[in-house]
Amino acid sequence: FNRLCMVHDLSAVTAALMMVRRDVFEQVNGLDEEFSVAFNDVDFCLRIREAGYLIVFNPDAEAWHYESKSRGIEDTVEKQERFRGETERFLARWTKDYVDPYYNVNLTLKGQDFSLRV
């Protein structure tokens, strides 16, 4: 759909390459420490949207990000339990009434390949 080539609004972006004004950061109380690793950026973006601001993706912004380089992979029982807990907290907070206004309703939610819903 060529979306990666265009500036457009999204519900959330990765914190690995995010810019936000300080006053907005403070208005929504920053990143929630309940999400120490997973979902902290998504939760933050959703709270920014609730406050009336847009989350904008800009394809001209570039950076190298080595996923999990500093914290390692989720390969221990402790890390997997933390991830499971953060997932449960995120879903409890956001999935009850949330519908992503930027996700095409004609696409499936069952995968990550943007295939058509059938």
Q: Which stretches of residues belong to each language-model region?
A:
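A short, conserved alpha-helix in the catalytic core of glycosyltransferases
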Residues: 2-29, 34-64
